[in-house]
Amino acid sequence: MHGSGSLLACLLPPLLLLGAAPGPAGALSEEEKHVMVELHNLYRTQVSPPATNMLQMRWDEELAAFAKAYAQQCVWGHNKERGRRGENLFAITGEGLDVPLAMEEWHHEREHYNLSAISCAAGQMCGHYTQVVWAKTERIGCGSHFCEKLQGVEETNIHLLVCNYEPPGNVKGQRPYQEGTPCSQCPLGYHCKNSLCEPIRGPEEAQDLSSLVPEAPSSLATEASSSRREGIDSSLATEPPPFLVTEVSGSLATKVLSSVETKAPSSLVTEDSPSMATKTPLSLATKVPSVLATHSLLSLDKRPATLLPKSTHDPIPKSADKEASSTRMPSRIPESSLHPKISLMGTREPLPLSQEEGEAEAELAHCSEILASVFPAQEKPGELQTTLKHKGHSSSKSLSNSPSASATANAVGGRTLALQSSLPDAEGPGKHGFRSGSNASPGHVGGLLLGLLLLLPLVLAGIF
């Protein structure tokens, strides 16, 4: 029995490393979702001049599922079926998706936007920025996907990020927000928090949270409770970790016995059979960092996440967040890669004309009208207006296949393509282009296979 425990101790670190590696699908982690919401709210509090009616942004799983489904199509262009949803796009080559870089690229457009005139500088784009700081938008959901081939782009192996928003921004003739004293015009039912209008939540908020957390399969809950009873000392059950108490929904908690509330990593007990759990030494179970043991209950692709290093943040800023704040890991902003990267950025296409619903002031104009009010006019229908920048000089071109470099991308040795949305009848996969000599991302499948080959001798040694 002791030998089996030693084998598990040897196998655990490489297994955790494999689990931490991003998969081919490139789904957003819980920490990335949290960072996305936090950066949106940070930039919304930093608008200058300040806003009187800026609502607090929160995560929406339905929007996230919608964005994920479109990202999986691997198309470099806006979703024509998005209805009354705002949309921002971003794509990048390299080792993985860089959420802070995407947000920085979108926010960088503020330098070209004139709030008083409700206009954007000639030859520039501002649609990303105005959507990020649109005061009446309060829900966001994003999805990402690793595309070996992105339709409409010549480069391969690209991480595509799609974010959808409700209510949508970039409405013709309207300012992103009203300038003045922060929170002085918060809607009824909202109160001020960090210069943002936050909804006043009641006791029923915990019940609302449970509806957003997918229930675990009954077989998984039974296996978890069985293995934990057999393999974990009952004395540990007296100290349930806070993140299990505050962030697991009521519907899920009723399916798992009270012995679930232990310090043992959930990834170990849900993946191993009961017999394996009985052989795991207690010292091993308690030494694994809890950040590696947290379980993603809000996976975009609805699959249970296991053996992945995730934050304990719930991406939806609800009342439970206050109780769990002491256990949350700090947001970590990924450092810029030393390898050259290529990032692509797509503006939020003006909203299509649709049926009247929601607020009266959110009436949407025809795409061509909104295009004229938000973005500079194009020389020909269907052309993409981009700006090509290099360190030695700069030039502005209106081309359907031209890269655009930003200062941020240059700082990390890469280039950025900004997608200027064309009119709906001219939009198509062939209308958006991308060219670059920068390197493509390393093969994700090759790295995973190499790790599995390294683990095979260890597993065989433990069996025989």
Swiss-Prot record:
InterPro entries: Allrgn_V5/Tpx1_CS, CAP_dom, CAP_sf, CRISP-related
Compartment list: Secreted
GO cellular component, one term: extracellular space
Classification via SMART domains: SCP (SM00198)
Biased composition (Basic and acidic residues): 311-325
PROSITE patterns: CRISP_1, CRISP_2
Residues bearing carbohydrate: N114
Stretches with biased composition (Low complexity): 395-411
Domain SCP: 37-165
GO MF term set: peptidase inhibitor activity
One GO term (biological process): negative regulation of cell growth involved in cardiac muscle cell development
Family, as annotated: Belongs to the CRISP family.
Role played: May inhibit cardiomyocyte growth.
Protein name per the record: Peptidase inhibitor 16
Species annotation: Bos taurus
